[in-house]
UniProtKB/Swiss-Prot annotation:
Keyword list, A-Z: Branched-chain amino acid catabolism, Cytoplasm, NAD, Oxidoreductase
Organism per entry: Streptomyces coelicolor (strain ATCC BAA-471 / A3(2) / M145)
Catalyzed reaction equations: L-valine + NAD(+) + H2O = 3-methyl-2-oxobutanoate + NH4(+) + NADH + H(+)
Subcellular localization(s) per the UniProt record: Cytoplasm
pH dependence comment: Optimum pH is 10.5 with valine as substrate.
Induction, per UniProt: By valine.
Regulation: Repressed in minimal medium by the presence of glucose and NH4(+), glycerol and NH4(+), or glycerol and asparagine.
Gene from which the chain derives: vdh
Physiological role: Oxidative deamination of branched-chain amino acids. Oxidizes L-valine and L-alpha-aminobutyric acid efficiently, and L-isoleucine and L-leucine less efficiently. Does not act on D-valine. The catabolism of L-valine is the major source of fatty acid precursors for macrolide biosynthesis and a vital source of antibiotic precursors. Uses NAD; no activity was found with NADP.
Record protein name field: Valine dehydrogenase
Pfam families, sorted: ELFV_dehydrog, ELFV_dehydrog_N
Residues annotated to bind NAD(+): 191-197
Protein EC: 1.4.1.23
Catalytic site positions: 91
GO biological process entries: valine catabolic process
Amino acid sequence: MTDVNGAPADVLHTLFHSDQGGHEQVVLCQDRASGLKAVIALHSTALGPALGGTRFYPYASEAEAVADALNLARGMSYKNAMAGLDHGGGKAVIIGDPEQIKSEELLLAYGRFVASLGGRYVTACDVGTYVADMDVVARECRWTTGRSPENGGAGDSSVLTSFGVYQGMRAAAQHLWGDPTLRDRTVGIAGVGKVGHHLVEHLLAEGAHVVVTDVRKDVVRGITERHPSVVAVADTDALIRVENLDIYAPCALGGALNDDTVPVLTAKVVCGAANNQLAHPGVEKDLADRGILYAPDYVVNAGGVIQVADELHGFDFDRCKAKASKIYDTTLAIFARAKEDGIPPAAAADRIAEQRMAEARPRP
């Protein structure tokens, strides 16, 4: 079902002619009193209620917002399937600059729209929305995760996200070098924010050599002051050219692997927390042609979604960490499937996810 009454022609064209097809439901939301304009996209509920965050962003057009919601919802179906969750994929986008129009009234109105879906969609934080925002949304909608601990939530998910990426690195090491240990391996991390700085801690604890960069020089300085063994370089271009780099971890913006970076990348493995690391589908073949092993981003960075899903059942950190530790086995299985089928790891991950969704019991 798609609610389309009064939708502009370009929005309808995006809905029905997108190459990200197959969505079960798309809801266009508007609340004039608060200024809310939003899109909720449910790609699949085959595995269970759709789970995915709410992005608050100043899209150039409503059609662009719809296209982003469709793409992100589809991605969440695959991420949740590979994380072993009993959840399908969904995503919501709120149109507008959060610095200008975000208000309690708007978030409450949004919560009412999510609640109207009766549990088919469970929301959480994403770009432009935060724990405090989810606390407000939850006042109107019980299908809300990513809340503060004071309001029954789990809070910051960066700890488990970094732990999952770390497990992905260990799996890549096992596959490529026959040993999961990262001791004496050189790992370059681009982006040492909430996730990246936790990743630094995991790697140092195991005895890895760590090289970092970030556009925020004060953040880099804080890390090198705490850990004098960490080496800082000027920018990502310098990082990907570091001699004897074993693993490259993009942990900032998407599109880090592109036609400019892949030809000069010195690492043997790419495994990081950033979303949408491949600038276009052909990039993974370029990596394979250079003998670089790619750990699919949506598989290794699933620690965060594992946490918000667990919140629905009463958050337990140890239970979540045990689930996130399985990212190691999942990543190994992807590498094995890729080798068996003669395809890149990202394509292998997609096949495994699609198989799990296809085998799931259809839900009304």
